[in-house]
Amino acid sequence: MSIRNVSIIIPCYKASATLRRAVASALTDAPSDMEILLVDDGSPDDTGALCDELAAADPRVTALHRENGGAGAARNTGLDAASGEWVLFLDADDALLPGLWSALDGVITDADMILFGLTRVSTGDIQPTDYLPAGEYADLAALGGALSPLLFDTGLLAAPYPKLFRRRTLGGLRFDDRLQINEDVLFNIQFLQISSAIYCLHGVYYKQYDTESGSLSRRLRGDLLDAERITRPALAALLRKNGLDPAPYEHTSRLRACLNQYGLLAGCRGDLPYARRRALFAEILADNDARAALQERLRNDPNKLLAVPYRIGVAWNWPGMLAAYTLIKQRLL
């Protein structure tokens, strides 16, 4: 079955600075049977008016308005309104890249998910075909050694992009809008539990502007470890369903969460209080593998002087020192 009739869902919250770019990128060379659903998530600025303006300018664009509920809730509103055979999620501060529609024209597949590559402003190109040949894969086990990097190293399988979902298979599946983080990871895991196959498309067709100030990757938050705990049972169930031992993947998931949470604490500004920082550092250092990985990373840190307190705090398991240093550094630098 060829790829036609795609619904693109764009959740919008205070997105007036980037939304035109996102919509223009989706419309470039797009087929007439494609639809774009702009979901204004109760934005307090002029985002809602811009959604209406863009919808008035092209019949393929529809503006939807809802009370603020977060990205997951906004995506759910889009899913409820979608009519396409396929669904593609695009963030309002990101963009689709030229060539996607022509590449999809050449795809004939019965798979329920089509996965392609993205480029991040911070790190460059990542695509599934860096790890395995293009084509259809019957289940996760068929991905072999590519599964772990696609899940954890690149996040290509875990994020709601860069991919298409067959809407018929989605059925009533929705994002858990009670979660503040990882609701997209849980959504993908749940979809993979009910889907048949994955098609890996060669090419980079999604651009993620992850260095902009509103990006989650640049905001200090303290819930990454809790979020990983919430999604771990669903991940284990998915892996068992595909005949895989979940233990090594659970270990990697936990290690990644520890390293990412450490990175946010050490590298991002925010108003997280000392007690919460200390508790998070203590939990990270209690994981021996995470502590060893951090020691190795800090040995190679190019910021020699600034890294000294981190090296001491990690080596001597002093979470209080690490918490205090991050606060002091934030105030002085």
Regions found by a protein language model. Name each.
Residues 18-20, 45-54, 95, 99:
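Acidic helix N-cap motif at the loop->helix transition within catalytic regions
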Residues 87:
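Short aromatic/hydrophobic "clamp" motif used to bind/position activated sugar donors
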Residues 24-33:
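Short, acidic, metal-binding catalytic loop of nucleotide-sugar glycosyltransferases
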Residues 40-50, 67-68:
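A conserved acidic beta->alpha catalytic loop
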Residues 66-82:
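Glycine-rich, basic loop-to-helix element that forms the pyrophosphate-binding segment
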